[in-house]
A protein has these predicted regions:
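A glycine/threonine-rich phosphate-anchoring loop and its flanking beta-alpha core
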Residues: 1-72, 163-167, 171
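A general structural signal for well-ordered alpha-helical packing
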Residues: 81, 100, 104-107, 122, ...
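Glycine-rich phosphate/pyrophosphate-binding beta-alpha loops
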Residues: 4, 109-141
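Residues on a specific face of well-ordered alpha-helices
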Residues: 7-9, 51, 55, 59, ...
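Short glycine/threonine-rich catalytic loop with a Thr-x-Gly-x-Asp
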Residues: 49-53, 73, 77, 114, ...
Length: 203
C-alpha cells in the first residue's frame, strides 16, 4: 500500500457512495497474504507520501488512547511509532530504500494496532473533509489532530478507559521524546509543517 493505510492487515473496508462513507468489517476481509514492497514508495508523489505517512502515525497514536486497546495493540503501536517518528520527515525529504522500508513496517504495525483497538475521534471527524472537500485522508485526519489529543489530556479525570490514560500519555511523550502535552503538540505541528500538510482550511 502507500505506507499509511495498513489495509493489508485490517478487517475493514470503506466504500463511498454519493459522497457518503460506508464501512464494512469482517475477518474475511483480512488478506491471506500480503507484500510490503518499499521500492514502490520511493517515487510516489510527496503529497501522497505525506498524507499516508501521517495517517500511519495517527493510527498508532489513536490506538494507544483507544478504549479498546490492549497489551498487544499497545505493543504494535509503540513499535510503529518508534520507527515512524524518526523516519517520516526523512522519507519525505530524502526518500531512499532504508526510510521507505521503515515507513512500510511502521504502517503495517499501525494497521495491526488499529485492527485491535480501532481509531478514535481524529479519524471519525476526517471523513466529511475527504468526501465533501476532497482533502486526502491522512491530511484530513491531521487537521485538528493535536487539538483532540490536548482535549483528552486536559480531561484525564473524565477518562472512561480501563487503563491509566495518564500512563499512556507518558508513553506517547517518551516515544516522541518530549516532556509534556505542549511539546507533543508542537512536535505534531512541526511534523505537519515539514510535510506541507496545511492546517488552514481557507487555503
Amino acid at each position: 500500500t502507500t505506507a499509511g493505510s495498513g489495509a493489508e492487515v485490517t478487517s475493514n473496508a470503506v466504500i463511498y457512495v454519493d459522497g457518503i462513507k460506508h464501512s464494512f468489517e469482517s475477518e474475511l476481509l483480512i488478506p491471506d497474504n500480503f507484500f510490503l514492497i518499499p521500492e514502490f514508495l520511493i517515487s510516489a508523489p510527496n503529497k501522497i507520501k505525506a498524507s499516508a505517512g501521517f495517517d500511519a502515525i495517527a493510527q498508532a497514536l489513536e490506538s494507544l488512547v483507544s478504549k479498546k486497546s490492549n497489551d498487544q495493540s499497545v505493543e504494535f503501536a509503540s513499535k510503529s511509532l518508534r520507527v515512524s517518528v524518526n523516519s517520516y520527515i526523512s522519507f519525505l525529504k530524502d526518500p531512499n530504500l532504508k526510510n521507505a522500508t521503515e515507513m512500510s513496517i511502521a504502517s503495517n504495525l499501525a494497521g495491526k494496532a488499529i485492527n485491535i483497538s480501532k481509531t478514535t475521534a481524529p479519524h471519525a471527524t476526517s471523513y466529511p473533509f475527504t468526501s465533501l472537500f476532497n482533502i486526502s485522508h491522512g491530511h484530513a485526519v491531521g487537521l485538528f489532530f493535536e487539538s483532540f489529543f490536548r482535549f483528552n489530556f486536559d480531561n484525564l479525570n473524565r477518562s472512561e478507559t480501563s487503563f491509566d490514560l495518564k500512563k499512556r500519555f507518558d508513553l506517547i511523550f517518551d516515544l516522541f521524546d518530549v516532556r509534556n502535552i505542549d511539546d507533543f503538540s508542537s512536535k505534531i505541528k512541526f511534523m505537519k509543517k515539514q510535510a506541507e500538510l496545511e492546517d488552514n482550511l481557507i487555503k
